[in-house]
Design a protein with these regions (language model features):
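A short, Lys/Arg-enriched amphipathic alpha-helix followed by its capping loop at the start of a domain
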Residues: 1-5, 32-35
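Conserved mid-domain beta->alpha element of the FAD-binding
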Residues: 2-14, 136-137, 163, 193, ...
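Conserved N-terminal glycine-rich FAD pyrophosphate-binding loop of Rossmann-like flavoproteins
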Residues: 14-34
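Conserved N-terminal helical subregion
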Residues: 28-168, 211-224, 228-230, 366-372
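Acidic/histidine metal-binding catalytic segments
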Residues: 44-47, 103, 233-249, 307-312, ...
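A short coil-to-beta-strand element that immediately follows conserved catalytic motifs
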Residues: 105-106, 157-159, 176-180, 201, ...
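Active-site substrate-recognition segment that forms the wall
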Residues: 179-214, 220, 224-233, 255
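C-terminal auxiliary extensions adjacent to catalytic cores
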Residues: 351-372
């Protein structure tokens, strides 16, 4: 829209509201948000973590560290932020509506599309048909647009589930945790803890190997007692966090992914984000990839008069990078769930996370990278 395109966003929800909790945005995504004029608003609602600290689940010993904060910004040209999902949604929605007050259409569920050489028609569940020049499917892991492009395949259940909850900092001991990302690693599970909303809220995500729970929705509540049992015997810091979570505010969902594919497009339609390359959350790059996708798609459309050529350029420049992140995230799940200190030490020695992330993950700039 900022580039002059006439855009309509069809959203299945009846209203734009809060869902989910924290997301992490590294410099490679934040540069795009800055391009959209959102630097000040992002800084207002976010937290800049000092570092990733990978800790042993019981002793809390730090096994590996990735510096962030000033070092990340100096090296990569933009901050590393933690932000509440609803805050970044609101910031983006406000910017969209500033550009065009009629851009967002609610209560609109996509079920497929039709296309020919003259255009593409989005089909909605209530019978509406929306005509346009190009269709961008950003409708998640169960994307109906993806199904039509790639073929209908079920997402792969990984045998892992994720817990999420938040705790207001006033419920925690004073100076409970520094402003870091603490990743607690242990047998068959791990936990990720960091601050949100200018440090007012602590975000907790716990990933557990559990093949019994296959509910995919992020909004389904589960038993606090089950959460407590999943992390029995873990460090006192984890116990303090769990003990201060509201018992009726525990959410649990199954972690699904798909193997990378080599086509996301037709001549007039394309998918991006989770609709194209859903991933496990272990590289904290799911939202980041979607933001990168948007930037590269915009640049591809600007560079080509022919829509099919633009979509091909977008795909050509995104397939390898997103596949690397998807596969790398799966591998990290194995590393985080080893069973002994000795295994963790060997694992982190083999895989220098700080080095690899700084060399290729964070160094990528979707606004300036050469498109081929």
């Amino acid at each position: 829209m900022q580039e002059g395109y006439n855009v309509r966003i069809y959203e299945q929800a009846p209203e734009l509201g809060e869902i989910g909790a924290g997301i992490q945005t590294s410099a490679n995504a934040v540069k795009v948000l800055h391009h959209l004029g959102l630097a000040d608003r992002m800084a207002e609602v976010s937290v800049k973590p000092k570092a990733f600290e990978f800790r042993l689940f019981d002793s809390g010993e730090v096994m590996h560290k990735v510096p962030l904060a000033e070092e990340h910004e100096e090296q990569h040209g933009a901050p590393y932020y933690h932000v509440h999902r609803s805050d970044i949604h609101q910031i983006l929605a406000d910017r969209v509506l500033e550009l065009d007050p009629d851009a967002v259409v609610l209560n609109s569920t996509a079920i497929g599309f039709e296309e020919d050489s003259d255009g593409v028609t989005l089909l909605l569940s209530d019978g509406r048909k929306i005509e346009g020049d190009v269709l961008i499917g950003a409708d998640g892991i169960k994307s109906s647009i993806r199904d039509q492009i790639v073929g209908v395949t079920e997402p792969n259940f990984t045998g892992q589930v994720a817990w999420r909850a938040t705790v207001p900092v006033e419920k925690l001991p004073k100076e409970f945790m520094d402003k870091i990302v603490a990743i607690w690693c242990g047998p068959k599970k791990h936990a990720v803890v960091y601050y949100l909303r200018s440090g007012e809220v602590l975000n907790f995500v716990g990933c557990v190997e559990n093949s019994d729970w296959q509910e995919e929705s992020w909004t389904v509540k589960a038993s606090w007692e089950d959460l407590k049992a999943d992390f029995e015997g873990w460090n006192d810091e984890i116990q303090i966090i769990i003990d201060n979570i509201e018992k009726d505010e525990c959410y649990r969902w199954a972690l699904n992914n798909r193997k990378p594919v080599d086509n996301w497009r037709t001549d007039r339609a394309v998918v991006l984000g989770d609709a194209a390359h859903p991933t496990l959350p272990y590289m904290a790059s799911g939202a980041v990839m979607a933001i990168e996708d948007g930037a590269v798609l915009m640049r591809s459309l600007n560079a080509n008069d022919d829509i099919a050529a633009a979509l091909e350029m977008f795909q050509r420049n995104r397939l390898d990078r997103t596949a690397r992140i998807v596969n790398g995230s799966t591998e990290l799940g194995d590393l985080y769930h080893l069973t002994s200190k000795a295994e963790f030490e060997k694992g982190f020695e083999r895989r220098n996370i700080a080095k690899e992330r700084n060399e290729w993950l964070y160094a990528y700039d979707p606004m300036t990278v050469e498109l081929i």
